[in-house]
Amino acid sequence: ENAAVHEVPIHDGVRTERHKLMYFPRNREWNLYDLLTDPNEMKSLHKDPAYNNVLAGLQRRYNDIRRFYDVNPAVIPNTRGDESWWRERDQAKKAIVKNGDIDLAFIGDSITQGWEGNGKSVWNKYYADRKPVNLGFGGDRTEHVIWRLNKGQFNNIQPKVAVVMIGTNNTGHKMQAPAETAAGVERILEIMKEKSPETKVLLMGVFPRGRTPHDAGRITNQGINQIIRRFDDGNHVHYMDVGNVFLDDEGNLPASVMPDALHLSEKGYELWAEAIESKLSALGL
């Protein structure tokens, strides 16, 4: 069965009888068209000084509508069931958790899934004898994790500790506002507490991305972390930002740690495991 749904932006622009404004969140750019002189929308006028007042007015209208409808896809459960590998992995993970004998769960995206790839030997060294499960799915955003948690991946387990890191694809795919991504993370924590109130959650700060400190994606991830660190309640949720262990003295991401400035090498997984080991022990694992 194909359980997929189509994700369609509810509001990606506004228009009047004459003008049309479009917003592109991935690169945070606006396009403005004069439908009277350019009915086929061939040339954007958003940088034309003659249209400054029109642009400003439509931007205000756009933002007012967004606030009114409170549109945030990061908190709306969303499946990727149209992708066969994702669907098969989902079914396989549900089979693993069905018996409930799990003490340690890792939840996230491709960086977490990578414990089965570049991080496999490190995983075996640190976690193989701790009744673990890897619930990382490459390409997932917060909304996909919400869907998975609600659809069986967290129904039969009561892990002692769950390591959660999610959000970098909200940045990479959409350049979503940090507050929106953080709201998705918060919803994930709420679901986990509802389903397994005794589980201690080690909430990871979203790892740095991009080769340099000035990378737009890295700055956005830092914005997410500034919000989600407040979710640490000292009891159920424990926040930990280990991003600095991956950086060199200039704040750059070495290729030896993240070859593509996003995903970890074996060395990167070793650094991650070393950074959280004492915390896992303190949480009772």
Task: List the predicted regions and their residue ranges.
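C-terminal cap/loop subdomain of S1 sulfatases and analogous C-terminal strand-loop tails that border
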Residues: 1-31, 35, 40, 53, ...
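Structural recognition of the beta-strand scaffold that forms the well-ordered cores
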Residues: 20-23, 31, 103-108, 131-136, ...
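Extracytoplasmic/secreted proteins, especially bacterial periplasmic and envelope-associated proteins
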Residues: 53, 57, 106, 140, ...
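N-terminal secretory targeting modules
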Residues: 70-107, 111-125, 281-285
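Acidic/histidine-rich helix-loop elements
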Residues: 73-80, 116, 134-141, 172, ...
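Oxyanion-hole/transition-state-stabilizing segment in secreted/luminal serine hydrolases
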Residues: 113-128, 142-186, 191-195, 202, ...
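Catalytic His-Asp segment of secreted/periplasmic serine-dependent ester chemistry enzymes
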Residues: 208-285
